[in-house]
């Protein structure tokens, strides 16, 4: 007879969600760096001003999420801008 493993403890779930959050922040670091470099170079930017603002809002939501009362519930993960997912 197979038995399902127990669900993760609250501490384990929080660690899992922090790792997910950290990975999402790391995955967007390059976009932020590229945009800033393009601005400093005076060249056309890959992201529009609106996209960059949305990206920074998303990153702020990721950083603030662990302080939110809904952390670490997966259903309440910050949502990435749709253009970033595509």
Q: How would you describe each model-predicted region?
A:
Residues 1-86:
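A preference for well-ordered globular domain cores
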């Amino acid at each position: 007879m197979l038995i399902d493993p127990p669900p993760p403890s609250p501490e384990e779930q929080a660690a899992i969600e922090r790792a997910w959050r950290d990975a999402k922040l790391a995955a967007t670091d390059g976009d932020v760096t590229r945009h800033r470099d393009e601005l400093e170079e005076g060249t056309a930017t890959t992201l529009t001003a609106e996209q960059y603002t949305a990206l920074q809002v998303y990153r702020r939501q990721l950083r603030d999420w662990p302080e939110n009362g809904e952390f670490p519930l997966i259903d309440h993960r910050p949502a990435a801008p749709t253009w970033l997912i595509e």
